[in-house]
Amino acid sequence: MNIIRYPERLEWNFLLKRSALQTESLRETVCEILEKVRTQGDRAVIGYEEQFDKVKLNSLEVTEKEFEEAEKEVDIKLKAAIMLALNNIQTFHSSQKFASKKIETLPGVTCWQKAVAIEKVGLYVPGGTAPLFSTVLMLAAPAQIAGCKEIILCTPPNREGKIHPAILYAARVAGVKRVFKAGGVQAIGAMAYGTSSIPKVYKIFGPGNQYVTVAKQQVALRDVAIDMPAGPSEVAVLADETANPTFVASDLLSQAEHGADSQAILITTSETLIDKVAAEVDRQLSELPRK
């Protein structure tokens, strides 16, 4: 941890700087991949999976047998945690459902608003250093509550051609019936244009690296809607001496794990808390399977 004490005003602008996405140099490469996926479909996706994810695939869609095997491999504690998180997410988003109210503006003239779900949505869950099953839940639960009729999910496989069991389990309990082994630009292209295996959707949701961000921006120009360009993860925790250092450290690490460009910041007036959180970060890091 880098500890900065009582920074002068002249330092504030520097401290507030965040990692910026430099996408111009990637655009040509991204557009080339998108065009091949558009014209060659599954063949291009499978080829790029071999090139970028170092895996040879015969098919892209996860089978029912793979879903069943994944459920057996996820331990009981993780299943319970996933279900608890799913319930919390569902409770939160259910409260946001649009309630229409009819208003008679003139005798015989009734006006109202109506919220209609997007019929087909594509969810993208990146690979990286950890299985982001929380991202699956955050994307799939709102789509289910909104009433989307077709929800598909793309995520990169490992070099054995498998999706992490926790990803598949989270997808299944959240209501996603179709998952595809595709990552990066090729996954975005497949959902934007459609292939013989992966259906075309009307809107793409989910975070990704710089290449995924550029791909989403490109397909949004004329082909399909997107949620937003996602930047590097960041969190700022404002805490005083009453804060639990274990919780603060966990909050910081939960965002820092997303990548080397993530920003995790603690703002506090307590020297004691700084020392306790720093020690707790070191302790939790020592117990994590990846650093």
Question: What residues fall within each predicted segment?
Answer:
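A glycine- and small/hydrophobic-rich beta-loop-beta segment
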Residues: H258, I265-K291
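Conserved NAD(P)+-binding/catalytic subdomain of aldehyde/semialdehyde dehydrogenases
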Residues: G175-Q263
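Short, solvent-exposed amphipathic alpha-helical segments in soluble enzyme
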Residues: M138-A140, L168-A170, S196, V219-R222, ...
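N-terminal Rossmann-like NAD(P)+-binding subdomain of aldehyde/semialdehyde dehydrogenases
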Residues: M1-E119
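N-terminal small/polar loop signature for handling phosphorylated ligands or for N-terminal nucleophile
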Residues: H164-G175, A192
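Conserved small-residue-rich beta-alpha loop and adjacent elements
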Residues: I103-Y169
